[in-house]
């Protein structure tokens, strides 16, 4: 990682920000407010044989060409694959999510993304929720503190009020 580019949780831990909005990471301890569960989907070429299934077994990624989305998304993908000891042939993709989806549509591999990442970009591919169910929890992180400023508490209340219908 570029030392000049800090990830949200690193900024929070270093005290360089009061609030972050991110996908929850188990290794980080903070005051966490869950806001949305973002479900994982298999992204497959349109002609991928699914045999009428309505979900894609995680185990089926094993040994397949897997186009890994860019950024720290590998953390979420590995969290979904590890419990089943699934090991796809990972091909890191240093391009945006839409380009990864286009690569899948051209038969260059398969991938896994969350609903938010793929929303509105599924032309030319087939999408199925993975099974067992997997995803990431999106939320708001704050410092662990007994003296949280009133402004931050009001922000959290406002965010919870606004997102109440999104889950």
Each language-model region and where it sits:
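Flexible hinge/capping segments at coil-to-helix
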Residues: 30-40, 44-66, 150
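Hydrophobic residues within well-ordered alpha-helices
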Residues: 12-13, 61, 102-108, 140
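Central regulatory/effector-binding core of bacterial HTH transcription factors
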Residues: 1-27, 94
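Short loop/turn segments at beta->alpha junctions
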Residues: 4-5, 57, 95-96, 114
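Short beta-strand->loop
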Residues: 31-41, 111, 115-116, 123-138
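A ligand-binding cleft/hinge motif common to bilobed small-molecule-binding domains
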Residues: 17, 23-30, 79, 97-126
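Secondary-structure junction motif
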Residues: 64-89, 148-156, 166
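A late-sequence structural motif
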Residues: 127-167
């Amino acid at each position: 990682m570029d030392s000049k580019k800090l990830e949200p949780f690193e900024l929070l831990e270093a005290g360089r920000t009061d609030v972050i909005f991110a996908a929850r990471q188990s290794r980080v301890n903070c005051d966490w407010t869950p806001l949305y569960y973002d479900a994982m989907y298999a992204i497959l070429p349109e002609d991928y044989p699914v045999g009428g299934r309505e979900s894609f077994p995680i185990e089926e990624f094993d040994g397949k060409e897997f186009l890994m989305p860019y950024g720290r998304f590998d953390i979420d993908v590995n969290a979904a694959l590890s419990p089943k000891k699934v090991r796809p042939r990972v091909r890191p993709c240093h391009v945006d999510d839409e380009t990864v989806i286009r690569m899948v549509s051209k038969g260059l591999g398969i991938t896994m993304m969350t609903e938010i990442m793929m929303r509105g970009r599924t032309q030319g591919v087939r999408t199925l929720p993975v099974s067992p169910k997997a995803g990431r929890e999106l939320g708001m992180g704050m410092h662990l503190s007994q003296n949280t400023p009133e402004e931050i508490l009001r922000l959290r209340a406002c965010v919870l009020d606004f997102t109440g219908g999104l889950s």
